[in-house]
Curated annotation (Swiss-Prot):
It comes from Caenorhabditis elegans. The lineage of its organism: Eukaryota, Metazoa, Ecdysozoa, Nematoda, Chromadorea. A motif (Arginine finger) lies at residues 511-514. Transmembrane segments: none annotated. GO terms for cellular component: cytosol; MCM complex; nucleus. Gene3D superfamilies: 2.20.28.10, mini-chromosome maintenance (MCM) complex, chain A, domain 1, Nucleic acid-binding proteins, P-loop containing nucleotide triphosphate hydrolases. Keywords: ATP-binding, Cell cycle, Cytoplasm, DNA replication, DNA-binding, Helicase, Hydrolase, Nucleotide-binding, Nucleus. GO terms for molecular function: ATP binding; ATP hydrolysis activity; DNA replication origin binding; helicase activity; single-stranded DNA binding. This is DNA replication licensing factor mcm-5. Its EC number is 3.6.4.12.
Length: 759
């Protein structure tokens, strides 16, 4: 049992504690002490050229702040002594305890004398950072077991914080023999109690039984630990494959640092643990081990919305971004580079460009935030390239998640609570809108979703949070993402005569979209000929590219011979890689605000749209002029502000000027206002014209006068009477009937043929 106290054996990360190698322990002790001395010198003396010793000062500052931790950059350690840095990377199980012991010694030196009541010296936790590109989760193999690795991904689940013993005291139940301060291996390996009593058995009346030891809870030293679930980044997952996961083990000051949905970069020890088996499991699995990562450092990607791998940009790339932003046609060029293989749809592409860049997120003095992300809905006929636009946005967005309406549930889009198979406690897993925090969620077949699932994303689209209150877990997750949705008509193709009957959406979900486009497949000889030529040309070029690949002709490089990123492709459009980096750069470094002149112009337009001009003759006669203007609400006003800010962001401007507001108003008119003016959004908050609203009120008053309470009338006859004799639109009459039925004033009977007035 003496080996239990041997630090050399305790920190070895192998399948078994004893490798069969004879070891006196003297060499290990001497090496251990030498490592402590080297690390002690590093912490005390390392400097980057200034007057201060960065790690000594950091340790002193943290210790007096009651944060007993020290963060060390491995590149600094490499500059100080490359040999011990290599040992720490290759054998962290052996070397890390020496580093923490050295930190504790230095802390004792620099904090003596300590205040009264704080004389006890606390253990120091050492966390690591690494200045190198993270490894993909798929590239971490068995060769890296027990070595330091750096990987990135998304946290999708987090268990609750628990306690784990680091030192235990064992006592024999029979003879009360005690083994104090038995060290427990860090990580998820656990600890096996000795099978036999270590006390001398001579002279005892009764021998101690097998498995005699128990732990004394009041004499154990414990630390906090938490297990997390890491999923590889969506952009790293090959098409057609499932994203891979890895369990993370955090302890002490690294617990409670992240929540599901956070993008993180992890430095840790790639470790293995025994495979958990049920009773009577397969005996051939005894040698199988499950990988997990013992975390030594967590870096959250909090550089802002639009987080991606492009967190740093070269001076040459920044020069290219500013050159593009200074062009007069920058806005037009970016819009044309959105899915260039799709013909036409210029305004839709401009709106998608605005969605990619987004407006400026604002936090008000009272703590309320105003979203800067833009939501766009595409409604219309099949075959109008809506899904292709969504697929392109998924590629070019810094963080893009694509999902289909029929295959999406409320839990899959927002968050779910599941039971942890190990601890049997409930843990939370983030859905698509949580994982896309800082990016774009593309929802295809939006009309095929169940209504209950659509309601679940109301909060995420406006407040940009997801509140969870399930299974004893009450929390709020961030979902700061834009939504690009595509839907078809209820009747397959768009029917002009049916107006708003083409869509089956609640007004609450439609009002959360900043721009709504009705995409129709109209018949036009000239347009059809141009479109057909474009489609054929795309297919011919694709076939030629495939033949070049077969012949071994190299593809067009995304970087030139000097390694500088290419700005334009062969057709004169921006390359996908450049556009993706430019979107990231603009979202990180630009947050435009409206100028006073632009604000005043927007206020004037808002007032005009809310209160249309009354002509002089009608004013003199005391009557209002007949108008069909759409009185917009404050929610649509905020949408116009976001659109103007996004256009300014494409030009890397700090302020949105008059021209940006004019273009934002134009985009809003050709999208939402045009869709509402044609009656396709009638009944939606703020999208019913004044004339239609007055007609609806008149029809309701006349209908209630036509038949008394308790009488029956044919629905067909009353609709025909209002349409033929009083010349109202059939859609308005049916809408009034639907409203009265919904309010409970009318009931439909006899297979919806008769109407019965209840009140």
């Amino acid at each position: 049992m003496s080996n239990l106290d041997n630090p050399g054996i305790y920190y070895q990360e192998r399948f078994f504690a004893n490798d069969g190698v004879p070891d006196t322990g003297r060499e290990l002790i001497a090496e251990y002490r030498q490592l402590i001395t080297q690390f002690r010198n590093f912490i005390r003396d390392f400097s980057t050229g200034g007057f201060g010793m960065i790690y000594r000062d950091q340790l002193k500052r943290n210790y007096f702040s009651h944060e007993y931790r020290l963060e060390i950059n491995l590149n600094h350690l490499k500059n100080f002594d490359e040999d011990i840095e290599m040992k720490l990377r290759k054998f962290p199980g052996k070397v890390l305890p020496a580093l923490e012991e050295a930190a504790k010694i230095v802390a004792d030196e620099i904090t003596t004398p300590r205040p009264k009541g704080e004389e006890k010296l606390h253990d120091i936790q050492v966390t690591l950072t690494l200045d190198e590109y993270p490894t993909s989760l798929r590239q971490v193999k068995s060769a890296q077991v027990s070595q330091v690795v750096k990987i990135s991904g998304i946290i999708v689940a987090a268990a609750q914080v628990r306690s784990k013993a680091t030192k235990v005291t064992l006592q024999c139940r029979q003879c009360k023999h005690t083994i104090p301060d038995v060290s427990i291996k860090p990580g998820l390996e656990g600890f096996a109690l000795p099978r036999t009593c270590a006390a001398p058995q001579q002279g005892q009346m009764q021998r101690c039984p097998i498995d005699p030891y128990i732990m004394l809870p009041d004499k154990c030293e414990c630390v906090d630990y938490q297990t997390l679930k890491l999923q590889e980044n969506p952009e790293d997952v090959p098409h057609g494959e499932m994203p891979r996961h890895l369990q993370l083990f955090t302890e002490r000051y690294l617990t409670d640092k992240v929540v599901p949905g956070n993008r993180v970069t992890i430095v840790g020890v790639y470790s293995i643990k025994k495979l958990i088996q049920k009773k009577g499991g397969d005996k051939s699995l005894q040698g199988i081990r499950t990988p997990y990562l013992r975390v030594l450092g967590i870096h959250m990607e909090t550089s802002g919305p639009g987080r991606t791998n492009f967190t740093t940009f070269t001076p040459e790339e920044e020069r290219m971004f500013k050159t593009l932003a200074q062009r007069k046609d920058a806005y037009e060029l970016i819009a044309k580079s959105i899915a260039p293989s799709i013909y036409g749809s210029a305004d839709i592409k401009k709106s998608i460009a605005c969605l990619l860049f987004g407006g400026a997120r604002k936090k008000l003095p009272d703590g309320i935030t105003r979203r800067g992300d833009i939501n766009v809905l595409l409604l219309g006929d099949p075959g109008t390239a809506k899904s292709q636009l969504l697929k392109f946005v998924e590629q070019v967005s810094p963080i893009g998640v694509y999902t289909s309406g029929k295959g999406s549930s409320a839990a899959g889009l927002t968050a779910s609570v599941i039971r942890d198979p190990q601890s049997r406690s409930f843990i939370m897993e983030g859905g698509a809108m949580v994982l896309a925090d800082g990016g774009v969620v593309c929802i295809d077949e939006f009309d095929k979703m169940r209504e209950d699932d659509r309601v679940a994303i109301h909060e995420a689209m406006e407040q940009q949070t997801i509140s969870i209150a399930k299974a004893g877990i009450t929390t709020t997750l961030n979902s700061r993402c834009s939504v690009l949705a595509a839907a078809n008509s209820v009747y397959g193709r768009w029917d002009e005569s049916r107006g708003d009957d083409n869509i089956d959406f609640m007004p609450t979900i439609l009002s959360r979209f900043d721009m709504i486009y009705i995409v129709k497949d109209t018949h036009d000889v000239l347009k059809d000929a141009t479109l057909a030529k474009h489609v054929i040309e795309v297919h011919v070029n694709a076939s030629a590219a495939k033949e070049r690949d077969i012949a071994g002709v190299p593809k067009t490089a995304t970087t030139d011979s000097d390694g500088v990123m290419t700005m334009f492709d062969t057709d004169g459009f921006l390359t996908i890689e450049f556009l993706k980096k430019f979107v990231t750069y603009a979202r990180l470094n630009c947050g435009p605000r409206l100028t006073p002149q632009a604000s005043e112009k927007l206020v004037n337009h808002y007032v005009k749209m809310r209160n249309p001009v009354v002509n002089a003759d009608a004013f003199k006669s005391g009557k209002k002029a007949h108008n069909s203007a759409i009185p917009i609400t404050v929610r649509q006003l905020e949408a116009i502000v976001r659109i103007a800010e996004s256009i300014a962001k494409m030009e890397l401007q700090q302020f949105a000027t008059d021209k940006h507001v004019e273009e934002a108003l134009r985009l809003f008119r050709v999208s939402t206002i045009e869709a509402a003016a044609t009656g396709n959004l009638a009944g939606v908050e703020g999208f019913t014209s004044t004339a239609d609203q007055e007609a609806l009120n008149r029809i309701e008053v006349q209908m209630k006068k036509r038949f008394a309470i308790g009488t029956h009338v044919s629905e067909h006859l009353i609709v025909q009477d209002f349409v033929a004799r009083q010349h109202y639109r059939e859609s308005l009459v049916k809408k009034v009937i639907d409203n009265l039925v919904r309010r409970g004033d009318l009931q439909q009977k006899m297979q919806r043929k008769m109407l019965y007035r209840v009140r």
